Amino acid sequence: QQCVLMEKPLGAVDNWFEPGHQFEWYFLLESSPLLRGSALHVSLDHAFTLTEQRGVDPQTGAVVAMLDLEGSAKDATQRIWAQAEYLRALTLRPESEASVLRQLQALQQRFLHAGGWYECRDENGEVSRKDMPSTTPYHLATCYRGLVEFLG
């Protein structure tokens, strides 16, 4: 997939891409005024659309962990940080209020609970990891900030 940013250098054996990283990079690059008009900036919309089509379940809004070069699920685990990055990226999409609200509700219902969050769900949507690693709050905080700016 030449329109997405791969996890390994181009041409590397057994390469893949992670929708969560695509959405994170989309947000960071799309929000940068320094990239406006560049070839990279122009390709962002196509990369977002492809990643959303291949890496997000249209029924549940679940973002899978990894896709192979053809865009098929290589790891269908659903990690909370990827869900948060997708939600944050949606805040920069045109006419996205309904999508943002739908994805926010999915995040709340599937991953958040009174004591914190579920780190991972398996391909069937069952909780597969209950610990709460210290790397996740970064993604939740930046998602929250994006939501505050978007929703006002």
Predicted regions and their residues:
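Glycan-recognition and catalytic cores of secretory/periplasmic carbohydrate-active enzymes
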Residues: 1-152
